[in-house]
Each structure stands twice: as C-alpha cells, then as structure tokens.
C-alpha cells in the first residue's frame, strides 16, 4: 500500500483528514474502512482507555511525530507550571515543522517536516534542519531565497490567499516568511483532538 493510500486509511479510521487527498476521500466516504456504507453503526460504548488511546493516536498523526516524542512532550507538559493540555498544545504548535505548515509553506505536515530536513527553511535568517526545533515568539520562519523557485514553494505562494494564517502568526510582505507573534491558545489551533484525553493517557 502506498504512503498516500495508507494516510487515507488512517484518516478514515481516526476520523481526521491527515492530507488534502484524505479530506476529499472522506467527503465521499464518511465512514471507517471495512464498512460499506453509512448505514452500519458500531455498537458498544468506548472505554476511557480506548478514548484516551484514540485521541493520542489522532494527535500524534496530525503532528507526524513518533510515539517517543509524543510521550516526552506530554510528560514535560505535566511537569511545567500551568494547564498541562495548554502546555502540550504550545509545545507541539511551536515546532518548526508545525509552523512551516501553519504558515502555508507546505500542503501537509509531512511535507513541512521534509522541507525542514532538506534545509529549505530558515529561522531568523539562519538555516535550521531540525523539524522539532522550538520556535519562540518574535522568531521569523522563512523559506530560503534559493529554494523559492522550487515548484512546491511556487505553488504554496500562489495558494496563500486561500489559506489564511492563524492569529498567532503574522505573514510578512514577501509571502514566504512569517513571524510567531505569541504562543497559541488551545482554541486557536487547527487540530481535531481532545488534548486532556492525551494527558490522561500518558498519566496512567
């Protein structure tokens, strides 16, 4: 099975669109894989553990990170002062690859991760090739000038108008640069997940 088809299958299983292709497919077939129509209803109430596991999987796949990374983020969120769920949101959303995606420079989170790893992204004018690199308020994330003629970035530039930046990001005049103005709130993040369930899962 191709990666694209696997992402579609995972999207249907978890009821989240991980890619644009998955979103279109789910519009046509809004039910899990293995079921042959919307008329089939699954019976039985999901246990607390299964709910927590499901939300953890949904969150991990939306940010395209490994289980070990997610566990570390959750544990740090609990140890840090403040609301653990809010802490988790901010830690994940301030990752460099997440901000490349939110800024509209990539069509998917995996693509954003790849762009960073391949050295196409700068933070405050310096190349950074670590997708998990934390970005701080005031930092500017940008596509390198030498990379802006790559078709993927040309396409992203053409589609920026249709993809408004979230309120905690400010797109700069050149289009392929954005500033993190502040840390996001849970309500502002475009992620389909009950963050509190994820915290509960790792607190077991």
Name each model-derived stretch:
Residues 1-103, 130-204:
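Ferredoxin-like alpha/beta domains used as RNA- or RNAP-binding modules
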């Amino acid at each position: 099975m191709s990666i694209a088809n696997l992402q579609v299958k995972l999207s249907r299983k978890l009821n989240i669109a991980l890619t644009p292709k998955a979103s279109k497919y789910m519009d046509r077939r809004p039910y899990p894989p293995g079921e042959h129509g919307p008329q089939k209803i699954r019976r039985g109430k999901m246990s607390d553990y299964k709910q927590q596991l499901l939300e953890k999987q949904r969150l991990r796949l939306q940010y395209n990170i490994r289980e070990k990374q997610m566990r570390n983020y959750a544990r740090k969120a609990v140890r840090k002062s403040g609301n653990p769920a809010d802490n988790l949101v901010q830690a994940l959303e301030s990752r460099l690859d997440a901000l490349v995606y939110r800024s509209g420079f990539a069509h998917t989170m995996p693509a954003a991760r790849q762009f960073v790893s391949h050295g196409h992204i700068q933070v405050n004018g310096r190349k950074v090739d670590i997708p998990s690199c934390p970005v701080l308020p005031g930092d500017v994330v940008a596509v390198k000038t030498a990379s802006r003629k790559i078709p993927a970035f040309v396409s992203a530039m053409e589609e920026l108008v249709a993809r408004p930046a979230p309120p905690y990001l400010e797109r700069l005049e050149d289009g392929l640069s954005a500033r993190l103005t502040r840390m996001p709130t849970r309500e502002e993040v475009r992620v389909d997940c009950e963050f509190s369930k994820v915290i509960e899962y790792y607190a077991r």
